[in-house]
């Protein structure tokens, strides 16, 4: 159509030709605008688009005082104000992620939602019922070096259970069957939409957000007992503290350039950067999705830097009364106390 219009203009007088070309240019410009509008509309419809960088989306699950029901909300960047979104959306995080709401819609609800002081709520784990928690071992160069191991050429995946999850200030149980409980601060990735046979180039499109995690481990059960299988050593109740919020990916410019650290009773134990990851997040998602369908709300733990207790000289393990602080740049801090197994 456009080639015919332009061709006919060439045979017009100079003045008419100028006006006709202006009209064609205007029509092309309008088409470009309409196309852009359609593209924007489509992106807003897609799973939690990053169209507005000013949106402060730190998603939480919480309880109000004197109310044991789980509620959905967002917390301010400084951690002082909670906005309750429970009247507008599902009250559990997995269902909310599955609902595929646009961030612009969420922002409108945040603007009008009930505001609460942090002191008036209890933060829960930001997600407590993922279908899967998939972890990776030996994924930091320093963690390989402290074990005198060559960095792997293939990822070593294993799993934890939803029953491992506790909140950002909940206790870690020192189970009676182990005396070798160890710390492992990790970056957790929360999946935003179903991922199956995903190419590495598009894998980050399937991420919803990030949070701080602790892959608490019973080393005796991980390494010696249970035939050397990880299931019990990694899967005991309370062995996966998460929090304090799921920070939407729009607020994380580069998840592979975040400082990550852990302390016990105020003493630094781990200090590293996610830039040390051997298998990056996109690689993990792509590899897993070739055989395991990742679902909205699934949690991927990306490994831990050097400094775990088992590989210290002499080895160090957590004891009742210890307080473990785990922190990642821009994502926040979780603080968990070790308590006796009653």
Predicted region positions:
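Catalytic-pocket segment enriched in acidic/His residues
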Residues: 51, 107, 114-116, 122, ...
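A generic local secondary-structure boundary/capping motif
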Residues: 48, 123-125, 145-148, 172-181, ...
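Generic beta-strand structural signal
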Residues: 131-134, 154-156, 170-172, 179-187, ...
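Short catalytic-site patches enriched in acidic/histidine residues
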Residues: 156-174, 195-196, 238-247, 305-309
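Structural signature of FAD isoalloxazine-binding scaffolds in flavoprotein oxidoreductases
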Residues: 151-168, 181-183, 319-330
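N-terminal non-catalytic cap/leader segment that marks the start of a structured domain
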Residues: 2-4, 11-16, 27, 31, ...
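RNA pseudouridine synthases
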Residues: 184, 191-193, 198-213, 219
């Amino acid at each position: 159509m456009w080639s015919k219009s332009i061709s006919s203009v060439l045979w017009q007088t100079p003045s008419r030709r100028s006006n006709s070309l202006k009209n064609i240019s205007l029509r092309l410009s309008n088409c470009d605008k309409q196309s852009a509008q359609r593209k924007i509309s489509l992106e807003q419809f897609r799973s939690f688009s990053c169209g507005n960088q000013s949106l402060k989306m730190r998603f939480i699950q919480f309880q109000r005082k004197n109310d044991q029901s789980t509620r959905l909300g967002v917390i301010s960047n400084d951690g002082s104000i909670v906005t309750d979104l429970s009247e507008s959306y599902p009250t559990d995080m997995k269902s909310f992620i599955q609902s595929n709401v646009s961030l612009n819609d969420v922002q409108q609800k945040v603007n009008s939602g009930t505001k609460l002081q942090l002191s008036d709520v209890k933060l829960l784990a930001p997600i407590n019922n993922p279908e899967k928690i998939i972890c990776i071992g030996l994924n930091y160069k320093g963690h390989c070096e402290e074990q005198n191991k060559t960095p792997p050429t293939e990822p070593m995946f294993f799993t934890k259970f939803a029953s491992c999850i506790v909140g950002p200030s909940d206790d870690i149980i020192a189970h009676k069957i182990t005396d070798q409980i160890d710390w492992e601060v990790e970056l957790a990735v929360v999946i935003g939409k179903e991922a199956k046979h995903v190419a590495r180039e598009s894998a980050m499109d399937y991420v919803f957000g990030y949070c701080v995690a602790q892959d608490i481990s019973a080393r005796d059960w991980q390494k010696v007992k249970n035939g050397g299988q990880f299931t019990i050593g990694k899967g005991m109740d309370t062995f996966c503290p998460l929090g304090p919020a799921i920070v939407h990916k729009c607020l994380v410019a580069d998840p592979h350039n975040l400082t990550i650290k852990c302390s016990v009773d105020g003493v630094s134990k781990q200090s590293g950067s996610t830039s040390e990851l051997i298998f990056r997040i996109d690689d993990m998602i792509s590899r897993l999705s070739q055989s395991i369908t990742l679902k909205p709300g699934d949690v991927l733990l990306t490994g831990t830097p050097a400094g775990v207790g088992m590989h210290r000289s002499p080895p160090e393990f957590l004891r009742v009364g210890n307080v473990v602080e785990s922190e990642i740049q821009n994502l926040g801090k979780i603080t968990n106390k070790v308590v006796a197994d009653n």
